[in-house]
Amino acid sequence: MVGRDENELQDVQLLGSQGTTYDFNYTPEVLEVFDNKHVSRDYFVKFNCPEFTTLCPKTNQPDFGTIYISYIPDIKMVESKSLKLYLFSFRNHGDFHEDCINIIMNDLIDLMNPRYIEVRGKFTPRGGISIDPYCNYGRPGTKFEQMADQRLIQHDMYPEKIDNR
């Protein structure tokens, strides 16, 4: 079957909504899922989110970065508009870059229980230092657990040239 019927989309409420509300405070409840129609296949889904902002927990100064989310879905998949609104909800959330990346990954694991997921942040420099945190997860007891270990070990073997974000 090609396409999706209304029954398959009943839990997707934000997509197509003309009255979108932007919450400036951390709101994981906004995340929505839909069913993966290809559960018999392993494949990656990647989101590139270049407009992520949050606040420094100490100074309240804004931090800017790009978030990369890659995952291998199982039964559920995250809906992209809800993900956009969720990431937007970090705007007034005060946390360190490393914490934000882990919070995002943990919320997505709780939401959709993927086979594998990795979240990477590329934050613009503050004080002359840029921070690029990376975290990942592979479902325990599966090949994805070993995959997570290998990708973590190799995630930055060939670091990029940092000249301008």
UniProtKB/Swiss-Prot annotation:
UniProt subcellular location: Cytoplasm
EC number annotated for this UniProt entry: 1.7.1.13
Catalyzed reactions per annotation: 7-aminomethyl-7-carbaguanine + 2 NADP(+) = 7-cyano-7-deazaguanine + 2 NADPH + 3 H(+)
Pathway in which the depicted protein is active: tRNA modification; tRNA-queuosine biosynthesis
InterPro entries per the UniProt record, alphabetical: GTP-CH-I_C/QueF, NADPH_dep_7-cyano-7-deazaG_red, QueF, QueF_type1
Pfam families, per database record: QueF
Gene Ontology biological process: queuosine biosynthetic process; tRNA modification
A GO molecular function held by the record: preQ1 synthase activity
Matching Gene3D superfamilies: 3.30.1130.10
Binding positions (substrate): 78-80, 97-98
Any one annotated GO CC term: cytoplasm
Keywords for the protein's UniProt record, in alphabetical order: Cytoplasm, NADP, Oxidoreductase, Queuosine biosynthesis
UniProt keyword Nucleotidyltransferase, yes or no: no
Keyword NADP: yes
Domain of life from the UniProt record: Bacteria
Classification via SUPFAM superfamilies: Tetrahydrobiopterin biosynthesis enzymes-like
Active-site residues, record numbering mapped to chain: 56, 63
Function, as annotated: Catalyzes the NADPH-dependent reduction of 7-cyano-7-deazaguanine (preQ0) to 7-aminomethyl-7-deazaguanine (preQ1).
Similarity comment: Belongs to the GTP cyclohydrolase I family. QueF type 1 subfamily.
Protein name per Swiss-Prot or TrEMBL: NADPH-dependent 7-cyano-7-deazaguanine reductase
